Amino acid sequence: MTFVILMYNIIRKIYIKIILEGNCVIKVNDNEKLNYYISKYNLDEIFSIDMKPHMELVMFNKNEHICKSGETISYLFFLVHGKAKVYISLSNGKSLLLCFNKPLKVIGDVEFIKIDTADSNIQVIENAYCVVIPLEKIRQYALDDSKFLRYISNSLGEKLTKISKYSSINLLYPLENRLASYLLATASSDNSEISGLTNDCNLTEMSELLGTSYRHLLRTLNKLYDRGAIKKNKDIYEIIDVRILEDLAGDLYE
């Protein structure tokens, strides 16, 4: 009994739920893991001054949002582990997929510049870690830091370059190519089980994200099934030939 209580207290000290950007996320009080990600991605070299005291590690569980459209962003996020999908909410109530984020990706750089609310939704598709810094601290210590501003400028430039690509994907690429890219991006780490393809509700959401109809999505899934790329095991779709999907997907949504 004493051992159980001891382990509970240790876990409680390491993982503390906090409210971040309106969401209940998990703050990870693990300096070793935090320092690992800082070192892995050289986050301490982004700034001319030492910003490590202001860095924290947070964890998002699968399907939680890092940010939502219209919400104020108070932190600069560095996605250091996991994958997230970026999509916009349209005036007709539907959503449209833009891309997928993988490490290292900066989130909140646009809002840092324009001091405004988020204009897109970012939802993790697997458990993810982010190193976060309060924007208040960045504006206090790094607003005139040329090294940091150069890094942010590069990040914004990269996003601007990709905007034209994202905007043309739904117009120029057939659904089969876009679906193949989506399936690869949302697959589990061993490229077997496909996340989010478990019921009609998820398929409806996916059809909206890919800018197509529910029926067209089903027809295209059946085409991939006939080609031997995927199979359906009860309510779960599985990838059985990654190469077929990779040939179709190219670098869409990357």
What is each PLM-predicted segment?
Residues 56, 65, 83-88, 106, ...:
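Short beta-strand segments in beta-sandwich/barrel cores
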Residues 66-71:
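Short phosphate-coordinating micro-motif centered on Lys-Gly-acidic
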Residues 47, 97-157, 161:
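Cyclic-nucleotide recognition modules
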Residues 8, 14-62, 101, 106-107, ...:
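Cyclic nucleotide-binding regulatory module and flanking cytosolic helices
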Residues 143-211:
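Polybasic "coupling" helices that flank or enter modular domains
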Residues 2, 187-254:
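Phosphate-/nucleic-acid-contacting segments
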Residues 74-85, 104:
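Glycine- and acidic-residue-biased ligand/ion/polar-headgroup-sensing regions
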